[in-house]
């Protein structure tokens, strides 16, 4: 069984037992969280698509860790004007493990 959930402004296809990194969630390590914005649920050939959410569907997950992604370097430049700007960015994330999908 798999589901498509929305969290942090992004959509993820998840199945039980998977680990994934999502946008930072304010929860403690080891805490169980529920992802209730389930857009679709599928099993085998059957697919249930919500309008916009599947009623009564919940994905339970456990918080494994918090961290920061690798640095993304931003470099802006205007040619012939001697203008250069360097900037870096590291996005925070939360690593979760999907425990169960109920629909």
UniProtKB/Swiss-Prot annotation:
Transmembrane segments: none annotated. PANTHER family: 50S RIBOSOMAL PROTEIN L21 (PTHR21349), LARGE RIBOSOMAL SUBUNIT PROTEIN BL21M (PTHR21349:SF0). Part of the 50S ribosomal subunit. Contacts protein L20. Keywords: Ribonucleoprotein, Ribosomal protein, RNA-binding, rRNA-binding. This is Large ribosomal subunit protein bL21. InterPro entries: bL21-like, bL21-like_sf, Ribosomal_bL21, Ribosomal_bL21_CS. GO terms for biological process: translation. Belongs to the bacterial ribosomal protein bL21 family. One of its GO terms (molecular function) is structural constituent of ribosome. This protein binds to 23S rRNA in the presence of protein L20. GO terms for cellular component: cytoplasm; ribonucleoprotein complex; ribosome. PROSITE patterns: RIBOSOMAL_L21 (PS01169).
């Amino acid at each position: 069984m798999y589901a498509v959930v929305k969290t942090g402004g992004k959509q993820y296809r998840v199945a039980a037992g998977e680990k994934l990194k999502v946008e930072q969630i304010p929860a403690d390590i080891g805490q169980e969280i529920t992802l209730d914005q389930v857009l679709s649920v599928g099993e085998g050939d059957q697919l249930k698509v919500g309008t916009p959410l599947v009623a009564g569907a919940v994905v339970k997950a456990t918080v494994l860790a918090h961290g920061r992604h690798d640095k993304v370097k931003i470099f802006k430049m205007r040619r012939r004007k001697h203008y250069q700007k360097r900037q870096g960015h590291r996005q925070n994330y939360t690593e979760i493990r999907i425990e169960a999908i109920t629909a």
